[in-house]
């Protein structure tokens, strides 16, 4: 009988302290998440120093809870996986140092994991990844299209040239007057409104898979500013609907076109914005029309969590891609450089 592989995974790249135990690359034995949303809400966004302080306060408890929930001990664990980047450097270092301490104390291999690779592998938990595939990455810090021909091979074929889609959502939400985190609230409002504004769709160069959302963001901000200056009533739901339709149309079109050009019949979506209902429905509709298999994780697996890090860590473990105790956190890591090829 093949021995089960247990990975203890740590994720502290931004404002969630999360620890998970993953068995054999898919089974979640535990996935403890300590959220900081309430602490950052009054600031209208994540404050790095506050995030780091909360990670320091919560990391030990979160590790212990994950082990208890999984009903395992550190002696049962085969390796420690940890997000090394990208992310907030102070936050990353809390998780990296905790993982290094565990690896040293219990003599376990240490596995560095790229945060975006983790988001991609969140899909594998509920629906086995099959290759080749196109991954659409949509989050607060990233908007990318990635071609994968096998496990841990990443070719970035498109990325944002300015704002990430999640960043645009948060800025538009603040302009409308919605509380942090704004993305889910814009999505909720968008379901109630009508597309009454002609906000731009930015396609960039012909056949380009890059994205740009700064122009759209500015168009929304300027529109609301002009209406307020002229005392013209603002129907917030209509603003949200018009903005979201512009975003979703571009994301959907480019993702489907990438699948067609690369001859791929599998599209996966990853990142916090993957929980957006408007985007999920648009992609589902177009994938059905184009006979493309679509996988989007459950909303709880779209946001930052350690389970996704553990799944990616499992495949890195199988490839023997370990780090020594000199491992550091990195605010920026190129996904292609992290690729197995």
From Swiss-Prot:
Q: Where, in this chain's numbering, is substrate bound?
A: 137-141, 170, 183, 187, 276
**InterPro entries tied to this protein:** ATPase_NBD, Gcp-like_dom, KAE1/TsaD, Peptidase_M22_CS, TsaD
Q: Disulfide bonds, which pairs?
A: none
A cellular component term from Gene Ontology for this protein is: cytoplasm
Its EC number(s) = 2.3.1.234
- Residues recorded as binding Fe cation, renumbered to this chain, are 115, 119, 304
Family matches, as Pfam families = TsaD
* Protein location: Cytoplasm
Can you name one GO molecular function term for this protein?
Answer: iron ion binding
Please provide the record's keywords in A-Z order.
Acyltransferase, Cytoplasm, Iron, Metal-binding, Transferase, tRNA processing
Name the reaction it catalyses. Answer: L-threonylcarbamoyladenylate + adenosine(37) in tRNA = N(6)-L-threonylcarbamoyladenosine(37) in tRNA + AMP + H(+)
Which cofactors are named for this entry? Fe(2+)
Biological function: Required for the formation of a threonylcarbamoyl group on adenosine at position 37 (t(6)A37) in tRNAs that read codons beginning with adenine. Is involved in the transfer of the threonylcarbamoyl moiety of threonylcarbamoyl-AMP (TC-AMP) to the N6 group of A37, together with TsaE and TsaB. TsaD likely plays a direct catalytic role in this reaction.
Which HAMAP family does the annotation name? TsaD
Q: What is this protein called?
A: tRNA N6-adenosine threonylcarbamoyltransferase
Gene name of the encoded protein: tsaD
